[in-house]
Amino acid sequence: MIPSWNSVGLLPALLDSLRDGGEELEVLVVDNGSSDGTVELLRERNVPHLALPRNIGFAAAMNRGIAATAAPFVFGLNADTVVAPGAIAALRQVLAGDPGLGGVQPRILQLEDSNPGNPAAARLYSAGMALTRDGRAVETGAGERQAEVFLRKREIFGVCGAAWLLRRELFARLGGYDESYVSFYEDVDLNVRARIAGSHFAYVPEAVVWHLGNASWQAGFERPGAENARLVSRNRIATQAKFIPATSLPRIVAVELGSLLRAARQGRLGATMRGKLEGLARLPRSLGERRRLARQGDLDAVRRWLGVY
């Protein structure tokens, strides 16, 4: 499942890697109203796709695409990824072999750091999603060389939205991505809800996917950095409010103030502040979701992962 938006320069490498991987796959690209020839490229290559008339956001596009397919496992990919041979088979084997797993994540490497033919030389993009003590999402191992610890299969808090394999049943039971997020932190929110519902996730290093890092997002905006800052600030607050313990509030306030200082240095103070105000305005909804989640499961299923990398 591949959402795209003005990704005509990115999709060929991904589609070629899926074709050459030796797997029988049902590929579907959901195009978010591209204007750069993406849909024409998909037609020329006979790639199954949904052509949406406008950009409805990453989260909504993924929901539309997954609803249009029927496979028991869904492999979600960003348009700026390349899949190494054997990756899908390795992920599927682990997920199919453990009914307690809701999803698995490959070893995601930085595409700009090296050639896809030489994974040993690349830096990590993600060895699994983790949460800081104050509930911010981080990618384990991001930017690091591949030490032995990143070459072992292990349980992780959650899966990175750039590349994951999930059970369709879990995705449907959770109601899919929260479309109000639009983009950014929608994967964090899904992981939070899955954990509270009793699901688990694993990191499978034998499976390798290369990721260019926000290239598929940047292609569609004149000022991608500012929009990124607004959405991340907004959606982080909305997500933290669903599970974070009250004892973490002083830490969160300190971190958020620090983020404003960094945003000012980067010329993104206005966008970051707008995002924070929007996140605060959403608090009644987020707290209502927190109460609902607490009735359905255990918030400690998320909290015990705070600060665990």
Show the residue positions of the predicted features.
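Short, acidic, metal-binding catalytic loop of nucleotide-sugar glycosyltransferases
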Residues: 16-24
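A conserved acidic beta->alpha catalytic loop
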Residues: 17, 31-40, 54
